[in-house]
Curated annotation (Swiss-Prot):
Localization annotation: Cytoplasm
Active site: E181
Protein name (database record): 3-methyl-2-oxobutanoate hydroxymethyltransferase
Gene name linked to the record: panB
EC number assigned by the record: 2.1.2.11
Keywords, ordered alphabetically: Coenzyme A biosynthesis, Cytoplasm, Magnesium, Metal-binding, Transferase
Amino acid sequence: MHKSVQDIVNMKKGKKKVSVITGYDYTLASLCDKAGIDVLLVGDSAGMVMLGYENTIPVTMDQMCMFTEAVSRARNNALLVADLPFMSYQASIEDAINNSGKLIKAGADAVKLEGGSIMAETISAIVDVGIPVMGHIGLQPQTTMLSQGYKVQGRTKDSAMQLIQDAKELEEAGVFSIALEMVSHEVAQIISETVSAPTIGIGSGVNCDGQVLVVQDLLGMYDKIKPKFAKRYMNLSEDIVKSLEDYKNDVESNTFPAEENWFSMDPEELKKLREQIGS
């Protein structure tokens, strides 16, 4: 039985930190689940990491459903949350509910969407139809990246007060958790102490109730963007490139495949074949 939304909520009550990994494919998600990660997040960052887009804007619902289906087949233990991509929920509450339902049908247990107070009514409507929602405030890649760029949020009193208000209104709307992206660590701590919903930090300091990293960042597999907050636990890209170079050299030198890598005929059958074809 995999973790439930209530299990994640209870972790904050029990003062236990929540581990979240963003992943997009069956193979790596299987390993994350095996490692005991609490939450698997299928992020719209798949657009950059898996599809090579410059940002998350082009990601579609069909793509998010595909990635969600792949990860859902891999998990046995973790809670599965999936991102609603750009313009899948902003235009109308009806869109938000319908598209949230698509992600649930694809295997998600909950959805995540960006936005503060302005999205409270939408979140409430999604929750009212029985779909759990994770909020996302601070840096919001779908929107703030278009206007403000990649900047830390909550460094002034006014911006901090707005973030705190956003968090309170999201909690009132019914979110079970709130992602805080690139929020100053002082403000992230205040929010974490103010709301009962677990906060999940993305570059927002150690005092959040949990943390999230993209698995490719953690493993050192994605070099296009290297955010300050992404700790690398290994540099797998170097090992992968070296292994591929070794394979190429083995092919060129005719040392791969070796005898243990191929299959053979029965010697008597081979003899008959050679006699028949005259070789």
